[in-house]
Amino acid sequence: QAGGIGYGKADQALKDKPKPGDKIVILGGENYRIGMGGAAVSSSDTGEFASGIELNAVQRSNPEMQKRAANAIRGMIESDENFIVSIHDHGAGGHLNCLSELVEDTGGIIDLDKLPVGDPTLSDKEIIGNESQERMGLVISEKHIDTLQRIAERERSPMYTVGDVTGNDRFTFESKTKGNKPMDLDMEDMFGSSPKTIMTDKTIVRHYSDIVYDKDKFYDYLDQLLQLEAVGCKDWLTNKVDRCVGGKVAKQQCAGPLQLPLNNLGVMALDYKGKEGIATSIGHSPISGLINPVAGSRNSITEALTNIMWAPLKDELKSVSLSANWMWPCNNEGEDARLYKAVEGISEFAISLGINVPTGKDSLSMKQKYKDEEVISPGTVIISAAGHCNDVKKVVEP
């Protein structure tokens, strides 16, 4: 399980409203033919599209560039005054998604010629819509551009001033060298006017045989159990990496003199001297979810909570927030109905516990197509729990 954990300051959490004349800036790498249509392809069956389309939709990472851009932003945050008006990451849709959301309430114009291009064969559509990772878009007033520029140069983060906030409620990409406007739309055409999606599916009731246990077949059962990846996977032996990068890892997955991966949760300290930190855990239950999607969802939350409970949480359950990652083979008969029940089940269960689920992710293409057959994955929700730990030295280990 790879991921990150951290915290944000409350006074940095709310964005300001961009004003006409403010500058639109990009921090990070160049545009390449990467992640074109990634959002659509990621929610379609593997093998549904031609290999060229699927290859162009694949995302590539550039962690070095990510670190440079993050350090530049961190430099602004840790200054006496943070001059960033608004900020947005580049995800699916690339510049189109990121930059339009920055100026959603005002409008803006982007100079296509100033967007960094690493591949000269890109079309205007590909420059605007590619999902090259490790880029951030932000709005900053013109008088503070030099400050950001100096910080970016210090951190070796590429920085590009690519446009202006206009206040005309239009979003425009314009190339002065070509004399064309690949995109010029009213903001109301882009936000809040899309039709509602209506999904139709039917519930399929599946019946399973009762569990039959024969003690004489114990070793056969054990052999089958150890074939499960969640039980017998040996990645922890081969993936030997430094799990204490940065020096704030208070609890990682391995424990004891043999360093077996038995810990129920991870804990990151907030600083180098204090005892407070952030605890995190995960939970999933694909097998029970196959039989009953509501039970599978509730079990995922339950596992995450019974894992994180071994850390002293400052406000007990009120300290915990959940993230739901939906791994589901949608658009297959009965699966949309199962997903609806699973989402409803998580919502009702979390509300009854007084826990929020403020964020999440989905991968709805959990299906592999072959020439003569198809294989779908069991619909699963993976729950990540995080909470305020008030003493990183009192976490219980197995």
Regions inferred by a protein language model and the residue ranges of each:
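Glycine/proline-enriched, intrinsically flexible loops and inter-domain linkers
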Residues: 1-398
